[in-house]
A protein has these predicted regions:
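Cell-envelope and extracellular/periplasmic
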Residues: 1-169
């Protein structure tokens, strides 16, 4: 794809897919990698870079304020890019690809999961009532309300998302 301003300035973009972006988020069951799932080894071995699916694994991190940088790049489906991808994300995509009307639609799978975290960390600032911090759900990592949302969800708002799959234990 070439974009030009009408003069001598142009930008060439290669390997572009236009399709549906799905976000997968939640706790440890969503975080479970494809390599750990029944049928995962076979799915990983069968992956080829010409599949019309791209994956984006958001780094596990927090922030006190909303961030704009994702800190990761879209990757082709290969045996190297899939082992730690959410198994739920992969099998969901596989299920979508079985529908005849969706077989030609490229898919973007965003894995933004973090096991052992409380729901409050994934909730935008100001959406929770003012409650004492001692009443908030515990987190294995001591993550504060909105801190996961700020770092692992807000940067994704640049994408038009088809849907979100949430898996809270």
């Amino acid at each position: 794809m070439t974009a030009s301003d009408g003069s001598d300035n142009s930008v060439i973009l290669e390997d572009i897919l236009i399709g549906d972006v799905w976000v997968f988020s939640g706790q440890s069951n969503m975080q479970m990698g494809l390599q750990e799932a029944d049928g995962g080894a076979e799915a990983i071995a069968a992956a080829t870079s010409d599949m019309p699916i791209r994956v984006l694994s958001v780094p596990k991190a927090t922030a006190k304020t909303p961030q704009s940088e994702i800190g990761a790049e879209w990757k082709h489906c290969t045996p190297q890019s899939l082992p730690k991808l959410s198994a739920v994300a992969w099998f969901f995509a596989h299920h979508l690809r079985q529908a005849p009307e969706l077989q030609a639609v490229p898919l973007g799978l965003v894995d933004s999961s973090f096991g052992g975290t409380a729901i409050e960390g994934w909730t935008p600032e100001g959406t929770l009532p003012n409650i004492d911090k001692s009443q908030l759900s515990g987190s294995l990592f001591g993550i504060q309300a909105a801190h996961l949302y700020n770092r692992m969800i807000v940067p994704l708002t640049v994408y038009k998302v088809k849907g979100v799959v949430w898996y809270q234990n």
